[in-house]
Amino acid sequence: MAECPTDLINEMFLRLRATTLVKCRVLSKPCFSLIDSPEFVSSHLRRRLETGEHLMILLRGPRLLRTVELDSPENVSDIPHPLQAGGFTEVFGSFNGVIGLCNSPVDLAIFNPSTRKIHRLPIEPIDFPERDITREYVFYGLGYDSVGDDFKVVRIVQCKLKEGKKKFPCPVEVKVFSLKKNSWKRVCLMFEFQILWISYYYHLLPRRGYGVVVNNHLHWILPRRQGVIAFNAIIKYDLASDDIGVLSFPQELYIEDNMDIGVLDGCVCLMCYDEYSHVDVWVLKEYEDYKSWTKLYRVPKPESVESVEFIRPLICSKDRSKILLEINNAANLMWFDLESQSLTTAGIECDSSFTADILVSSLVLGCKGDPTQAQRSKDQKMMPKSTKRWDGFLSKGFKLKL
């Protein structure tokens, strides 16, 4: 390796998938330093995003994670949930190769399936302001703040009153975790936004509580309850400034009975559907321009499903002629041909307990390791200097790692 030019090694490594690079770290100290350097990690991720190389479909089960290579569906890898605690583990977001995991509102982690690195978030209790209030729905969001170079997890708790109690509106708690600071903070929510979370008006399906990231903002949809005089709403959270606002969308969609939010080709998209007939897909082509909302296409209900309860676009094909859709669950992954307006199965087998997402093969840890390990390292540094003499029996170039 010493005779091979550094630039050539760097270029070769940039072409490899993250799982291979993890193994290459042990080749030599220079390889270890190169692969772990922030500059290389950023360059590797940038190449993946620009070329679409080594993209994977992440199949998310209650007890198992499974990755399937998009270009080679026969290449499958199973990954046990690192947060296993006897119950079901949710995956509430995926960004730049990092995913958010949740066993409960106080048991969360950030995990990179390619490097198997995990960062468990410090426990943050839900602070109910009054005894008569209890938890109802919990919204989550995982995003990367490109301004502050920081991964963040947003937890929004929608509260409700205990039976027989009256109060308007019910409080909403918003807390944000910063990976850089490894700490939580509370974000104040203005009254006009608290009203939007009144449980009487809105009903949340579990997966609608996971935020989607576009333009350095996390977004959640608040679908109105059928039969209630209310409008659909889209909440947005600025990952850099902590500002919470509302994203505008066409008025004709205000009273849609079935609507979901997603990301298509880097743009916010809305799926409005007649569960027994079709799904209309709308896209906000220019984030700052409300008038750029466009109805792109109508997807017919596939014959293989009785009704459409949930639909989400995952990714465009490389030639941009097709879009991969998840319909109801990962057992119904289908390619939608934009020209013929037809659906064909993606040929990826799994049962209906799995849901799907797109995963980038990256070295972005989005995590600094397990906090318990970090604490052990911190304690080690605080040990008396006399303990360092035990390194003396090791060969030159080695260190004793406790």
Swiss-Prot record:
Domain F-box: 1-49
InterPro entries membership: F-box-assoc_interact_dom, SCF_F-box_component
Name of protein: F-box protein At4g22390
Organism: Arabidopsis thaliana (Mouse-ear cress)
